[in-house]
Amino acid sequence: MSEKQVPIIAFNQVDLSFGDTHVLNNVDLEIEAGKFYTLLGPSGSGKSTILKLISGQLTADSGDISFEGQRVNDVPAEKRKVNTVFQNYALFPNMNVFDNVAFGPTLKGMNKTEIKNKVKEMLNLVKLSDFVDREIDELSGGQQQRVAIARALANDPEVLLLDEPLSALDYKLRKSMQYELREIQQRLGITFVFVTHDQEEALAMSDWIFVMNDGVIQQNGSPEDIYDEPINHFVADFIGESNIVDGIMKEDYVVHFVGKDFENVDAGMRPNERVEVVLRPEDLDLTSIENGKLVVTIEDQSFRGDYYEITARDDDGNEWQVQATNSAIIGARVGLTFDPEDIHIMRFNESEDDFDARLESYEDDDEI
């Protein structure tokens, strides 16, 4: 982040407990203006709690929450420049589409012409301009979600918070809404903070992702960085599918696993350090035993539409997931091949700061 740019939202050592349950553990985060952020994690990871702290629905036990450099811990929710879209939409069933979207501008004291123009602008934005007089119970789930977004944006928030807003929609509609939300955010240029447990949603929409588990931000970064360079077992397993096996980092760019040494592109670790090795299923190719870097036995497969999901096992008992364009024969022994850059190495208990510093150090060495 540029030194001159003050984050629109920042958490500094934020801690929160509910009774004996520690919900957030000394969370630090920074959110820049005008980007799409996602808080990603399983149920109970603390992601929705962060959203409620931003909106003012909850108060932290300790630590500072700031908005554009100003501490807001004690600022009430109604005075914060944020609006929230909820999973259940929270629309007013006794009001039609126009009145739902006009609710916020009316409370702000806009005149009738301003309200009409604002509602028209918001409904155009969410592609519901022809639904202005519809009753809420006449709308589909996707249409109700669009109305909820329009209503939240009609208040001109600097930050829009979205708490799992797509989880109740069917798969095709959810995919469509992913693109629409991203388009809306880019058109408006305001900050979106999106909460989800769905890693596909996070990867598809986000500029930046915070991966959470047990009240701790495990890793934050761009979708590409988090997918390609997971920091630990949890992130590697939660973001996409992963094959994870134990290994030993013999020296820079050489790792030992399943009884063999393999070239890779990682460095900056101690000689003979115990590590975990990650290979993504889509990076593995089936080949002949003679050409394979590993030899496995095919145990199972399922057709996934554009690929076969194949389960195999090596002679050491490690299970391997492979995505292949062609089917395999159950019980057959085959080879697996992959490239050095497909191997990702994870250290045990490496902090995110140390992880980033290590990557930067050996990437700089490669450029010399």
From Swiss-Prot:
Ranges of residues in domain ABC transporter: 9-239
Broad class of where this protein is predominantly found: membrane
PROSITE patterns to which the protein is assigned, alphabetical: ABC_TRANSPORTER_1 (PS00211), ABC_TRANSPORTER_2 (PS50893), POTA (PS51305)
Subcellular location: Cell membrane
SMART domains cross-referenced by the UniProt entry: AAA (SM00382)
Organism: Leuconostoc mesenteroides subsp. mesenteroides (strain ATCC 8293 / DSM 20343 / BCRC 11652 / CCM 1803 / JCM 6124 / NCDO 523 / NBRC 100496 / NCIMB 8023 / NCTC 12954 / NRRL B-1118 / 37Y)
Binding site for ATP: G41, P42, S43, G44, S45, G46, K47, S48
Pfam families found in the cross-reference section: ABC_tran, TOBE_2
Catalytic activity: ATP + H2O + polyamine-[polyamine-binding protein]Side 1 = ADP + phosphate + polyamineSide 2 + [polyamine-binding protein]Side 1
Annotated disulfide bonds: none
Parts forming coiled coils: none
InterPro entries: AAA+_ATPase, ABC_SmlMolc_Importer, ABC_transporter-like_ATP-bd, ABC_transporter-like_CS, Mo/tungstate-bd_C_term_dom, P-loop_NTPase, PotA-like, Transp-assoc_OB_typ2
Role played: Part of the ABC transporter complex PotABCD involved in spermidine/putrescine import. Responsible for energy coupling to the transport system.
Keywords for this protein: ATP-binding, Cell membrane, Membrane, Nucleotide-binding, Translocase, Transport
Family: Belongs to the ABC transporter superfamily. Spermidine/putrescine importer (TC 3.A.1.11.1) family.
Example of a GO cellular component annotation carried by this entry: ATP-binding cassette (ABC) transporter complex
One function term, GO molecular function aspect: ATP binding
Protein name per its UniProtKB record: Spermidine/putrescine import ATP-binding protein PotA
Name of the top EC class for this enzyme: translocase
EC number, as in UniProt: 7.6.2.11
UniProt keyword Transport present: yes
Subunit comment: The complex is composed of two ATP-binding proteins (PotA), two transmembrane proteins (PotB and PotC) and a solute-binding protein (PotD).
Membrane topology: Peripheral membrane protein
Keyword ATP-binding in record: yes
